[in-house]
Amino acid sequence: MKMGHFEMVTTLLAAAVLMDIFQVKAEVLDMAENAFDDEYLKCKSRMESKYIPQMKREEWANDALLRMVWDNAEIQWEARKAQLFLPRNFKDTYGIALTAYVNEAQEQTSFYHTFSSAVKMAGLSRRRYIYNFPFKAFHFYLVRALQLLRRPCEKSYKTVVYSTSPDISFTFGEQNQARLGNFTLAYSAKPETADNQRVLTIQTCFGVAVGKFLNKEDDSVVLIPLSEVFQVSRKGTSNDLVLQSINSTCSYYECAFLGGLKTENCIANAEYIDPRYLYNPDMDNQKLEDSGRNNLDPDRMPEIKVLQTEENPLLPDEKPDRSRGKANNPTPGLVPGPKSHPSASSGNTLLPSVMASTILLVASAVNFIEL
């Protein structure tokens, strides 16, 4: 029987839809340029004191699932924190965020997938982060937790951990460097995999042992930050990949909420070169640990520039630091409040009024002319 034009078109469309549904898309291992990777190194104090609290109130009010995940993690954190050695400046909000994330990632919950998908794409542009990333406070707390819990590289690097990914691909070229592009759980036990899975053998400098946050007494589970840079190689003749940390993180964003624009290259983040005290309120003995990161070699990273850490943040009404490279996207205007744009997690009170600044400038000019 001859098929009519309409039936043929319908059949082809149905076939295309089915192919799209059942097709397994390969995950590309690269520098993850679209991931939101702000480390807040120049503005962490200003962000936490002036902006993060309001973001938290608004984001928690707008997301019942986030609120439930946070409340459950807070109960677990309160029960565990007395058993942990923690830096003196490690805050409860950091511990709750870390507890929440590792629990959700371990269980592969809907919150984990929603948050991870949002992080992977929020770095497309600063505008995307400002208007379409409803996890600004949670991301900040999680980043700060990993920063403060990092160990010296010689301690974390010697532990090999493994992660699996379905049909991940990597294109070998001149540099062969990559970032995982998300907050990734890895395990000390090599997993059994199916035929369509690759094993990533990882040696990390910035991964944090989070077993105790999962009620485990060992360091068998490690959480790796999305900004850590790895040298990638192939393991023998297999398709499995070996990721060896170059002892550096890099970011395309720095203080994005305060005006920092996306850079053309991934900028290496300088680490703090100061000791930190690990503190447990139930124990008198303090353990002093050196950060162990005083040798960042920019020559090993020809495409990565080094950003010096300093506590001299951008003011909201200042222009972004152009030394981080030419921005790919223009700075968006004022961030609208939740009433006018529900996906923006910060209200008008967070950023100064352009009109007010203009009036001040005009008034100053008039006074100058009169003088």
Curated annotation (Swiss-Prot):
**Residues with lipid group (GPI-anchor amidated serine):** S345
Disordered: region residues: 306-346
Q: Does this UniProt record's set of keywords contain Flavoprotein?
A: no
Name any GO cellular component annotation.
plasma membrane
Task: Name all TR mART core domain ranges.
Answer: 64-250
Reaction(s) catalysed (UniProt annotation): L-arginyl-[protein] + NAD(+) = N(omega)-(ADP-D-ribosyl)-L-arginyl-[protein] + nicotinamide + H(+)
What membrane topology is annotated for this entry? Lipid-anchor; GPI-anchor
**Disulfide-bond pairs as recorded:** C43-C255
Binding positions for NAD(+) per the UniProt entry: Y101, N182
| EC code | 2.4.2.31
Any single GO molecular-function term of the entry would be: NAD+-protein-arginine ADP-ribosyltransferase activity
For this UniProt record, the keywords arranged alphabetically read as follows: Cell membrane, Disulfide bond, Glycoprotein, Glycosyltransferase, GPI-anchor, Lipoprotein, Membrane, NAD, NADP, Nucleotidyltransferase, Signal, Transferase
Q: Which InterPro entries match?
A: ADP-ribosyltransferase_ARG (IPR050999), ART (IPR000768)
Question: Which interval of the chain is the signal sequence?
Answer: 1-26
Q: Reply yes or no: does the keyword DNA repair apply.
A: no
The EC category is transferase
Propeptide positions, renumbered to this chain?
A: 346-371
List localization entries: Cell membrane
Q: Which Gene3D superfamilies match?
A: Toxin ADP-ribosyltransferase, Chain A, domain 1
Which family, according to UniProt?
Belongs to the Arg-specific ADP-ribosyltransferase family.
- Listed name of the protein: Ecto-ADP-ribosyltransferase 3
The source organism is Mus musculus (Mouse)
